[in-house]
Amino acid sequence: MTKDLLDVSVDKAVDSPAPKGAEAKVHHHKNGKKVFHNPWPSWHDLDPEAVKAHLKQRKWMSTWTHPSTAEAKIPFQTPTLSRERFSNGTSDVRATWLGHACYFVEFPSGLRVLFDPVMTDRCSPSQWFGPRRFTQLPCAVKDIPFLDAVVISHNHYDHLSHPTVVEIAKLHPKAHFFVPLGNESWFHASGITDVTELDWWEGADLTLSSPGQSDRKIEPIRARITCLPAQHTTGRAPWGTDKTLWASWSVASPPPDQSGTGNTVASVFFGGDTGYRAVPTLDAQDDDWDEKYADLPVCPAFEQIGELYGPFTLGLLPIGAYEPRALMAPIHANPRDAVEIFIDTQCKRALAMHWGTWVLGDEDVREPPQRLEEALAFKGLARKGVFDVCGLGEVIRIPL
């Protein structure tokens, strides 16, 4: 892990494109206990009492379900990660799904980025209780040869793991963490100081270069990492709700304004954990994408992201944990929502995530990929080769 360590520098003085009015920072809560909020009509707050009442009603009406994982036959393989930083030999982006929202991405420039790593059995405050992984972890932190940047979407336990980030900092001491606003102090308390904290529509330039004493000199590897909006919530305890920000991210290497002649930019949009539109409680036979619900507002941020930062080489987009729909829709996209986000953000290709690892919703654990194919067909898109589901540990090559 520690061979071929490159010096890392981060510059936050970056002029990042932002939509009109972004300087008002309307997602910053001005009053009350919360620090941040979702500022769009596509959101409605999750009322804890309403959630309790809904779950109680479902229990008494015998509609409570806990999905079985017995038949969850998700393809698995040990990932083949490049052992040489520049051994790719092509201009492909290589993306490897490590479970749930964790992807390891190898850029043609030599950059290596890990998104939302949770490499523990459970996603909870303790490894003694909480949701338990029902599929095998493809690899451990020690199996990752190079790691330059770790990008975190938010602080929920299925996206931010204390044991995992501490191990990363130990085994990859020069890896730099990029986090949404309000999370830096948590990392410092965990003994991790190589952290850059960003607000929505803020970016930073990452530069990797050969150490001064190194005999092997390389051209600097450059990337621009930009914090972008998502529709979600945060909190690692009941008293910490929405006191830190949640985000999606753009990673482009090299930065678009520094690509130079002959250097093609590889760009990845990481959706993190996000909803797309709040929906009402429906009758069992209804679909919230039926024509009669066409006026329900959608989150406008994704279209803004596509206009300002697209097209993206690759999108990493969530497709699971969407049932019960009326409760989950504000915070978790279902496959139909995910296809809309794919289109809004102008991703050329996409890979699915946020499914197949922990039971976090009521849907059948095998259902998200099936519904994704249906959603693609509904929009007139190919079922394969556009927005795909990959196996655990599978390395997918995306040409530029």
UniProtKB/Swiss-Prot annotation:
Enzyme class: hydrolase
SUPFAM superfamilies: Metallo-hydrolase/oxidoreductase
Basic and acidic residues bias spans: 1-14
Superkingdom field: Eukaryota
GO molecular function, a single term: N-acylphosphatidylethanolamine-specific phospholipase D activity
UniProt-listed Gene3D superfamilies: Ribonuclease Z/Hydroxyacylglutathione hydrolase-like (3.60.15.10)
Pfam families referenced in this protein's UniProt entry, alphabetically: Lactamase_B_2
Keyword Hydrolase carried by entry: yes
InterPro entries named in the record: Metallo-B-lactamas, NAPE-PLD, RibonucZ/Hydroxyglut_hydro
This protein's record includes keyword Hydrolase: yes
Upregulation: Expression is positively regulated by the leucinostatins biosynthesis cluster-specific transcription regulator lcsF.
GO cellular component assignments: cytoplasm
Stretches the record annotates as Disordered: 1-31
EC number: 3.-.-.-
Residues annotated as transmembrane: none
One of the GO biological process terms: N-acylethanolamine metabolic process
Pathway annotation from the record: Secondary metabolite biosynthesis
Keywords recorded for this protein, A-Z: Hydrolase
Family: Belongs to the UPF0173 family.
Function description: Metal-dependent hydrolase; part of the gene cluster that mediates the biosynthesis of the lipopeptide antibiotics leucinostatins that show extensive biological activities, including antimalarial, antiviral, antibacterial, antifungal, and antitumor activities, as well as phytotoxic.
UniProt cross-references to PANTHER family, sorted A to Z: N-ACYL-PHOSPHATIDYLETHANOLAMINE-HYDROLYZING PHOSPHOLIPASE D (PTHR15032:SF4)
Name this protein carries in UniProt: Metal-dependent hydrolase lscR
Originating gene: lcsR
